[in-house]
Amino acid sequence: MDLRKFDIIKSNANTIFMQVYQPSQMQLDKLNGLMRTRNMYASTATPVGTRATVTIEPALYKEVASHWPSGVAVITAADNDGKLNGLTMSAVIALSLSPMQFLISVDKRSLTLPIIKDGGRFCINFLSSSQADIAMQFASKSTDKLASVKHRISQWGLPIIDGVVASITCDVHSIMPGGDHELIVGDVLDIEHFGGEALVHFKRAFHTIP
């Protein structure tokens, strides 16, 4: 169809519609207002696929994150020379059932991270409700955190802390960057369930489940 003819037909159709419908001035004003609002949002919205630049204070991020209850674990590891270390962590995720995998998030500054990478294995110790002191011990910068903590070395060569609810031993499957942390996916080698009540972290304090 000739585009000029199409424009004439379209214009005539709009004219006929306005003559038949005859909207009030109030309705026209409302429609114009809606169109202006739509155009305003269309011009300011962030296009899909682009990253919005919003400044969020780290303190707010931490405060909001602290309102998410989580279990508390100590991740233990051993390097190829037998050096042991560990760290306290709440960022533990049961990632997959088939195959069985867990994910942990380790700060890039952690002294335990290079040990995990070197040994290629780690153990997740789920702390019990009576082990808040152990959580604090492994959250410290001490280089010999296991010295004052009762534990045994498993058949996989990793420390399992006495009195924990459960332990999960994993082989490192993959490591990927996650901001100022590294995300480590582990294939489950062994699980030991000892029972008991788990330690919970909520609002920057340790709690027990009643």
Predicted regions, residues:
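Basic, polyanion-binding surface patches
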Residues: 2-210
